[in-house]
């Protein structure tokens, strides 16, 4: 495997359009929202005062992916009612968390270790508690996304 220079760069005027143009494979399109939709969601969520962080994932100067997370302690408005009504949710409700909301590597750059390294850096960023302490980190993924599940489980 080639040596990587993976790092996270906050979304800005210089990189947002390139991030919007990133794509996953056809099979993966049902696993993650488009980056354009994700940035719109981030804008709306942040306009309500929720801390949202959106990053381009870069290898050197090349944008290879996108990651977005938020901080909160309230799940009001969350789309997955099945989870909100679960016993597991009751354990977490009202406790501060970081939610890895979006995570993707462009189809041209998959299989090179960029996902693993950038996910590690995402967790390292969260450990700085940029919006305050949190008791847990949560993410969601489609059950058919076997590659994503394997990646996330490798971090515990």
Per-range role (PLM):
Residues 116:
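Residues forming the Rossmann-fold NAD(P)(H) cofactor-binding site
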Residues 2-108, 119-121, 125-131:
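Acetyl-CoA-dependent GNAT
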Residues 106-108, 112, 143-144:
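Active-site acidic-Proline motif in GNAT/NAT acetyltransferases
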């Amino acid at each position: 495997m080639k040596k990587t220079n993976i790092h996270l760069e906050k979304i800005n005027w210089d990189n947002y359009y390139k991030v919007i143009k990133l794509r996953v494979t056809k099979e993966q399109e049902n696993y993650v929202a488009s980056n354009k939709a994700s940035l719109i969601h981030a804008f709306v969520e942040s306009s309500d005062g929720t801390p949202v962080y959106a990053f381009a994932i870069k290898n050197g100067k090349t944008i290879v992916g996108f990651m977005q997370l938020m901080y909160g302690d309230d799940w009001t408005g969350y789309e997955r009612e099945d989870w909100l009504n679960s016993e597991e949710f009751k354990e977490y409700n009202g406790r501060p968390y970081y939610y890895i909301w979006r995570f993707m590597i462009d189809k041209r750059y998959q299989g090179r270790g960029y996902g693993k390294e950038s996910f590690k850096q995402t967790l390292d960023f969260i450990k700085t508690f940029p919006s305050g302490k949190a008791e847990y980190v949560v993410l969601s993924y489609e059950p058919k996304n076997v590659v994503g599940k394997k990646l996330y489980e490798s971090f515990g």
